[in-house]
Amino acid sequence: MTKKKYYAVKHGRQPGIYTTWNETKEHVHGFPSAKYKSFSTRQEAEEWLEPPTSNDTGLQAYVDGSYDKKTGRYSYGVVLLQGGIELARLANSDNDSRYSTSFQIAGECFGCLNAMQWGIRHGYTEITIFYDYLGIEKWATGEWRANKPVSQDYIRYYQQFKSRIAVTFVKVKAHSGVEMNELADQLAKKALKQ
């Protein structure tokens, strides 16, 4: 007996949930950058389709990373907010050879971890992390395998921190005018010069 599948179309001719592949194909075949996925339950499909939301009253962190080829330094910038009010800015750089071969990705990872640590130190139990590098979420959720030291250590520390602070990830497009993401980017670039 064939299991029933639910096909969620996030980006296609007509986003929605479909119960047959043929119906789904009509909405994604030939559609540029179509995004769709199959699930065994309708609820899973609905949850995947639901756009990520953030708790405006909770802690929010915008994180970004940067890298300088000349110096081999990577950096991060973080802007922390609550209810639209800026609470803190974090930025730092390093050139640890274990991580510098991952370029700005190392900065993105350390920015995320430092945002979580800041939240824990200040008594928060939830944080929404806005990021532009997909690995930040995919490594944390186990969807991507960690093959390099930076991603392996990121996962190790993330696992330790997540028992003390719940994380919601929200992907933002890089360099697209998202004000706080642009500020995090500027902080990361500035940290490379200090």
Roles of regions detected by a PLM:
Residues 47-60, 160, 164:
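A cross-kingdom feature marking charged/low-complexity
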